[in-house]
Swiss-Prot record:
Belongs to the acetaldehyde dehydrogenase family. Its EC number is 1.2.1.10. The keyword Transport does not apply. Coiled coil: none annotated. Keywords: Aromatic hydrocarbons catabolism, NAD, Oxidoreductase. It comes from the Bacteria. NAD(+) binds at S15, G16, N17, I18, S164, A165, G166, P167, G168, T169, R170, A171, N172, N291. One of its GO terms (molecular function) is acetaldehyde dehydrogenase (acetylating) activity. One of its GO terms (biological process) is catabolic process. This is Acetaldehyde dehydrogenase 1. InterPro entries: Acetaldehyde_dehydrogenase, Acetylaldehyde_DH_C, NAD(P)-bd_dom_sf, Semialdehyde_DH_NAD-bd. It comes from Paraburkholderia xenovorans (strain LB400).
């Protein structure tokens, strides 16, 4: 699609780093989506000022201002890039209007969606949750392993640049770990999971790096796991080009202490280690902010997939 008349109008709530980067992505690369409104609460924020310069309608009074906006009736999709706490209220206010909500906070009111893994299962959901940046990066790897061999336990460590972690990210650290841990099980397919986030203060800033550990049966096919992981990397790269393996998948006999969830397991186990890095596309944010880029890219891919199935006049 090329004409704006043939695209669905969307609103973005949250004028911080994630919301602004998502706006730029939609303006540059939206196939079925166009910007209808950019919503914040600080008129002096860089995001709102940038939206004005780019000709995007702006709202400076938050969700209440969006609902009162004369063009709200044309909005078909709303991206929420605020916080987990704020999203609960936003969802209640938006639900009666029948708009589709793509939640980029850890609120997890709707089902978890990782585009490369389970988007087709939730195309009709009124509210979908994009998990977390660490979840978007690592859960595809857990799913890649679990689709060829049982994963009894998965643990992920997401290391992001401190400079890329804004106030919203820092305020949601607890929600990050809980939401990501739940999604490792619900979407990744592990029997138990744990998530850890590290804010790396290094200067110059380093790009996002993630480590995924999976405990699998000792007789698991290593070649099948490697093939599945490589295929999944290719799938994620269709919407996050900077997503890549940092080195080959590693296999080691697990001789350490079993996680509490597996304390009764005595059979030999194999530890699968996957090392990733995510480089941002640099649309609005620096390339080291791959953690933010993968969230906005996944959200856009999800909304585009949903919108492709719906007529614009619906």
């Amino acid at each position: 699609m090329s004409s704006n008349d043939e695209k669905h109008a969307v609103a973005i709530i949250g004028s911080g780093n994630i919301g602004t980067d998502l706006m730029v992505k939609i303006l540059r690369h939206g196939k079925h989506l166009k910007m209808g409104a950019f919503v914040g609460i600080d008129p002096e924020s860089d995001g709102l000022k940038r939206a004005e310069r780019m000709g995007v309608p702006t709202v400076t009074t938050g969700i209440d201002g969006l609902l009162a906006h004369p063009d709200f009736g044309s909005i078909r999709y709303v991206f929420d890039a605020t916080s987990a706490g704020a999203h609960a209220r936003h969802e209640q206010l938006l639900r009666p209007h029948g708009v589709r909500v793509i939640d980029l906070t850890p609120a997890a009111i709707g089902p978890f969606v990782v585009p490369a893994v389970n988007i087709d299962q939730h195309l009709d959901s009124p509210n979908v949750n994009m998990v977390t940046c660490g979840g978007q990066a690592t859960i595809p790897m857990v799913a890649a392993v679990s689709r060829v061999v049982p994963v009894e336990y998965a643990e992920i460590v997401a290391s992001i640049s401190s400079r890329s972690a804004g106030p919203g990210t820092r305020a949601n650290i607890d929600e990050f770990t809980e939401t990501t841990s739940n999604a490792i099980v619900q979407v990744g397919g592990a029997k138990a999971g744990k998530a850890i986030i590290v804010l790396n203060p290094a200067e110059p800033p380093l790009i996002m790096r993630d480590t995924v550990y999976c405990l699998v049966p000792g007789d698991a096919s290593q070649s099948a796991i490697v093939e599945s992981v490589e295929q999944m990397v290719d799938s994620v790269r269709t919407y996050v080009p900077g997503y890549r393996l940092k080195q080959a998948v590693q296999f080691d006999e697990f001789k350490g202490r079993m996680p509490q969830e597996l304390a009764t397991v005595r059979a030999p186990r194999l530890k699968v280690s996957v090392f990733l890095e995510v480089e941002g596309a640099g649309h609005y944010l620096p390339s080291y902010a791959g953690n933010l880029d993968i969230m906005t890219s996944a959200a856009l891919a999800t909304a585009e997939r949903i919108a492709a199935r719906q007529p614009v006049t619906a």
